[in-house]
């Protein structure tokens, strides 16, 4: 009886309503006032720490280039950059033509994490937890973007910078780059969700080694433990970006609505229990089944096998 009612409800649900519901789910945050998190108060505190910028360029290819731009401080996140990252994530949530995203640092290095000026000023446990919740909210929304994302690690990704790479679907390094979770050396643990995501990427045992040893992961070591997906041949900033775009193209060929639906489906499987993940997969299927790309593919009569 319950199954019949659910099916009846599903049949009455319009595709537009399903799309609206899925878009709302993408933008959901982990924390709100019920968790003691007051976003506007945190924003006011972060505004006090200027410097750098988060720059977004949208390519006609459907690839977005997100650049952490604070080179005088190894692209460390100022308070303003944390706020701008959230703004860019919200913009990307609404970029319906987008299929892929590359996040990188300016001037051939990725990021050294948090700007120490902000860290020193926000020194109480309450401040630390507030910024933690803000960045976990932002990076979870980043992770849920319906775009296939790649962290292009040129130079060093340290501390919070290393955590940001874990919010991406894939990670690419050059022969000269390094990833290091230095949190232990700072007397803390990862606070932007990096430990949780790292366990998912490389498993609990390897994650414990990486975190407790504050290990320096060069490209070969990172590749061996499954932290990164490939090593790019060039270390030149411009050439390396081109190589990353070419690498990403193999996964985003096809109509945006199909690529985005695939990413949404995988994101659901990672976060939900089996029953909920299957239901979400059903909902996402309803946004592409019978659509232009599906009908065109069916009309080709299996030519994709050749």
UniProtKB/Swiss-Prot annotation:
UniProt-listed InterPro entries: ClpP/crotonase-like_dom_sf (IPR029045), Enoyl-CoA_hyd/isom_CS (IPR018376), Enoyl-CoA_hydra/iso (IPR001753)
**Keywords recorded for this protein, A-Z:** Acetylation, Cytoplasm, Lyase
Catalyzed reaction equations: (2S)-ethylmalonyl-CoA + H(+) = butanoyl-CoA + CO2; (S)-methylmalonyl-CoA + H(+) = propanoyl-CoA + CO2; (2R)-ethylmalonyl-CoA + H(+) = butanoyl-CoA + CO2
Q: What class of enzyme is it?
A: lyase
In its UniProt record, a GO molecular function of this protein is: methyl/ethyl malonyl-CoA decarboxylase activity
Q: Where in the cell is it found?
A: Cytoplasm, Cytosol
Q: Which residues carry this modification: N6-acetyllysine?
A: 216
Which EC number(s) are documented for this chain?
A: 4.1.1.94
Q: Which PROSITE patterns does the protein's record reference?
A: ENOYL_COA_HYDRATASE
Which residues carry the post-translational modification N6-succinyllysine, per the record? Answer: 216
Output a single Gene Ontology CC term carried by this record. Answer: cytosol
One GO BP annotation of this record:
fatty acid beta-oxidation
Q: What is its main location?
A: cytoplasm
Task performed by this protein: Decarboxylates ethylmalonyl-CoA, a potentially toxic metabolite, to form butyryl-CoA, suggesting it might be involved in metabolite proofreading. Acts preferentially on (S)-ethylmalonyl-CoA but also has some activity on the (R)-isomer. Also has methylmalonyl-CoA decarboxylase activity at lower level.
* Family assignment from sequence similarity: Belongs to the enoyl-CoA hydratase/isomerase family.
Descriptive protein name: Ethylmalonyl-CoA decarboxylase
Q: Please state the gene responsible for encoding this protein.
A: ECHDC1
